[in-house]
Structure formats: structure tokens, C-alpha cells
Regions:
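Short glycine-rich or small-residue beta-strand-to-loop segments that form or flank ligand, phosphate
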Residues: 15-16, 40-50, 135, 352-359
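Gly/Ser/Thr-rich loops at beta-strand to alpha-helix junctions
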Residues: 2-3, 47-56, 139-145, 360-362
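Flexible, glycine/charged-enriched surface loops at secondary-structure junctions
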Residues: 69-73, 180-195, 239-258, 315-331, ...
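Active-site glycine-rich loop that binds ribose-phosphate moieties when present
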Residues: 114-128
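Gly-rich Lys/Arg/Thr-decorated short loops/hinges at beta-loop-alpha junctions or inter-strand turns
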Residues: 2-18, 37, 82-110
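C-terminal non-catalytic interaction/assembly regions of soluble proteins
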Residues: 267-418
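Catalytic or ion-translocation cores adjacent to nucleophile or general acid/base/metal-coordination motifs
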Residues: 24, 65-82, 147-188
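A conserved active-site cap/scaffold subdomain adjacent to cofactor or substrate pockets
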Residues: 164-270
């Protein structure tokens, strides 16, 4: 669940009380539920969004349609959604300060769209221990989804920090799917085979905390030490303090070793006690934006795109339009590396002009969208790329990370019979 996804789901639920969860999860479960029951395969997913009960109910109805009554239980984990508690929390002095800016949440109180604490593995473990074959959560850590079945299966103690850290790192490695099995891998990327049929990663865990990352045979991609290393540094932060609700993992202790074709053994991991806080993901409305694009062709593609940007800005100034920010990128010249790219070649085949504006007032953003198309006939020559029509105004949903005392969050576990 991406940060912005929760706000989208809150809006969906506001329009339809039965909505607010990952709708594509239910048809996927329809495909695999019979096999899960037959082979005793457990499924853990944070597909519940802001309506975990609704998602679980839809899965239950699907299971009944498949004739699986009485053959499985669905665990429901809630307690992460604190949107309705914001005023109470602020009133009791819990400021929910922005972790990046240190601003108190009260500065954006009237624009909040969603607020969810990241739950860890323990409530999922409780659901598994209660016999759940399917466990559905709302906001939970990606690592907790992987750690929970290890705790359930091996009976790890809640203070066995090294093993909890190992399970956490296993979750970190596989949380982005094929990103660790060849997808977007920089190391010798041209030689990675058959990404069209890329194999998703598997973590083979053992009770001592050592695990192996692999993938299914006869699938594409590659699992090797470089592919695992690249994933390890993804969204890592301080390598000595990878903080989760369950523990703090020390990435500097990780050891990797090839364990055969498409197999990497991960071991030596150390951890320590978790903090007394949970992270909260808050989304809020932050104004509006619009982005317009045009493509200019050789010769002088970059110069034409720059000239078009100058013309556009002059016209916007003449209209006295006020924006919080206006940003220009030249895709194909320097959009990725910015000033580090140096001066673009004078012989580029084509350059896309990409201009975006943002602001708190929708009116000037709307007016901006009407100024891109005129450049087609009143700007530099050899222009294309306008078939998509006028740019559209979009609401900006911003992210507000905060911390909350663990004592303020009480996960709730319910087990539903099919």
C-alpha cells in the first residue's frame, strides 16, 4: 500500500461504504483459494486498505461461491486507522510532528485525508495462531507481513531480536517483488535472462534465522549476491538502525553467500529492541497541479524546447498568473540528471518539453492548461506530441510522516469463519 493509496481509498469509501480496499485482491483470491485450501497455503496481505472488514467479507463471499464453506478462516487485523482520533490525540498533546520538518500536525489539520499507523507482525501472528488461513490487514509494515509467518511457524520469542531482525530483513528483500530477482537490477543488466517471464522471489526460512532467497525454476530474472545487495540499500535509511515496530535491524551485520543457481544465503544478522513509537502515515490535501508536454524534433530540438518554454512563461507572466512553483524539464536532454548532465548535444533527435505548475488556488492552474496547445501553432517549428489533449488539473496529496506512542495504538484481531 503506497502512502497516497490510503487517501484514495478513504475517498472511495466516502462515496461507497463497501469500498476502500484493494479491489483487485478479490478476483486474484478467486483464482487461488481452492489450491490454498487443498494444499494448506496461507495468504497474508495488506489489501484491506481502510476497509479491512469489507475486503474480508468480499473474500468470504468468494470462498462460499467456490463451495469452500467451513474449510477456512479469515483473519482480520484492524486498529491502524486513526483518522477519527486525530482531534483527541492533538487535544491530549500528541502533536504528530512531521518527521522531516518538525511542524506540528495542527498546521494542516483541516486538510487531512487519511492517517494510519504502521502495525507490525504480532497481530498477524495472533491471527495465524488462531487458525486463520487468510490474513487481511490495513496499514502494516511490509517486513511484518514476512516476519509474522516465521514467528508463527518457529515460535520465536518476542524478544529474540536477532531472529526478528533476520525475518525483518527477509521481508525487506522480497517486499518489492521481482526487484530483488532481476527487475531493475543495474549489475550486468543486459545479461539478465527473460524478464518477460521474471520469477518472483521466495524466502526459504529456517528456525535459526538463516534464510535463502530464490525463485521458481523455469522463470526469468536472476537471484545473486548483486541483485540482493541492490535491494538491501533500497529505502534503507541508517544501515545500523532499520527501525520497525518489531525490532531494530542492523544491516551492517548482514552476510551474503551464493548458495547455488539463483540462490543466495543470508545470515549473521543482528538486531535489538524496537522503539516505543510507531510510524504514522498521514496524507493531506496540498493544492493542485497540472503538467503539459510537447515534443520538438531535430534539428535544434533542445533549442526549440527552450524557446517554447520561454514563450510559455512570458505568456503566463502577461496573464499575471501566480503559482507556488513552476518547473521545466527537457526529457531526453537533462530531465534525469539535471545540471549534472552538462550541456545537451546540439544533435539530439528529439526533446520533450515538460512544464508543470502547482499552487493552492485551482483557478490559475486551470488557466495554465489552456496555454500549452497554442504553442503548437504559435511557437517553434517541428512540434508534435499533443494528441493527448489539454493537461488536466490534479489534486496534490502530500505525505506527512509522524510518530505516535505505541501505547496509543491497540491492534484488533478478529477471525471470520467462511
Amino acid at each position: 500500500l503506497a502512502e497516497v493509496t490510503m487517501s484514495i481509498m478513504q475517498k472511495q469509501k466516502a462515496r461507497d461504504r463497501a469500498a476502500g480496499y484493494a479491489r483487485d485482491f478479490v478476483p486474484l483470491m478467486k483464482q487461488i483459494l481452492p489450491a490454498c485450501v487443498e494444499r494448506d497455503i496461507k495468504v497474508i496481505a495488506n489489501a484491506g486498505g481502510v476497509n479491512v472488514e469489507g475486503c474480508a467479507g468480499a473474500v468470504r463471499e468468494t470462498a462460499r461461491d467456490l463451495g469452500l464453506q467451513g474449510k477456512l478462516k479469515i483473519g482480520i487485523v484492524t486498529g491502524d486507522d486513526i483518522l477519527d482520533r486525530i482531534d483527541d490525540l492533538l487535544g491530549r498533546g500528541i502533536k504528530l510532528r512531521n518527521m522531516d520538518t518538525d511542524e506540528p500536525l495542527v498546521t494542516v489539520r483541516n486538510r487531512i485525508q487519511s492517517a494510519n499507523a504502521y502495525l507490525g507482525a504480532q497481530p498477524i501472528v495472533e491471527a495465524l495462531d488462531g487458525g486463520s488461513q487468510i490474513v487481511i490487514t490495513g496499514r502494516a509494515t511490509d517486513t511484518g507481513l514476512t516476519l509474522a509467518p516465521m514467528i508463527h511457524e518457529f515460535g520465536w520469542a518476542a524478544d529474540d531480536w536477532d531472529k526478528l531482525a533476520a525475518g525483518t530483513i527477509a521481508g525487506h528483500i522480497i517486499e518489492c517483488g521481482a526487484q530483488c530477482s532481476g527487475g531493475i537490477c543495474q549489475y550486468e543488466w543486459k545479461t539478465i535472462p527473460d524478464l518477460a517471464n521474471v520469477g518472483f522471489p521466495i524466502a526459504e526460512a529456517s528456525s535459526d534465522g538463516i534464510f535463502v532467497i530464490t525463485k521458481h525454476e523455469a522463470t526469468g530474472g536472476r537471484v545473486n549476491v548483486p541483485s540482493i545487495k541492490e535491494q538491501l540499500v533500497y529505502e534503507m535509511g541508517d544501515p545500523r538502525q532499520y527501525i520497525t515496530p518489531d525490532c531494530i535491524a542492523d544491516f551492517t551485520t548482514i552476510q551474503l553467500a551464493d548458495d547455488g543457481a539463483d540462490r543466495v544465503r543470508v545470515f549473521g544478522i543482528k538486531g535489538r529492541a524496537a522503539t516505543d513509537s510507531l510510524k504514522v502515515s498521514i496524507s493531506y490535501s496540498a493544492g493542485y497541479k497540472a503538467v503539459g508536454t510537447l515534443v520538438y524534433a531535430w534539428p535544434d530540438a533542445y533549442e526549440k524546447a527552450k524557446a517554447a518554454d520561454g514563450i510559455l512563461r512570458a505568456r503566463l507572466d502577461r496573464l499575471s498568473l501566480q503559482f507556488d512553483q513552476i518547473m521545466t524539464e527537457y526529457v531526453g536532454a537533462n530531465a534525469t540528471h539535471g545540471p549534472l548532465a552538462g550541456e545537451p548535444s546540439s544533435d539530439l533527435a528529439e526533446v520533450q518539453l515538460r512544464v508543470g505548475v502547482r499552487g493552492s488556488d485551482r483557478t490559475p492552474i486551470e488557466r495554465f492548461t489552456k496555454e500549452i496547445a497554442p504553442l503548437i501553432l504559435t511557437g517553434p517549428p517541428a512540434v508534435t506530441g499533443f494528441a493527448g489533449g489539454r493537461p488536466k488539473v490534479e489534486e496534490i496529496v502530500a505525505y506527512w510522516p509522524a510518530l505516535i506512542p505505541k501505547s496509543e495504538i491497540t491492534p484488533h484481531v478478529e477471525i471470520m469463519e467462511v
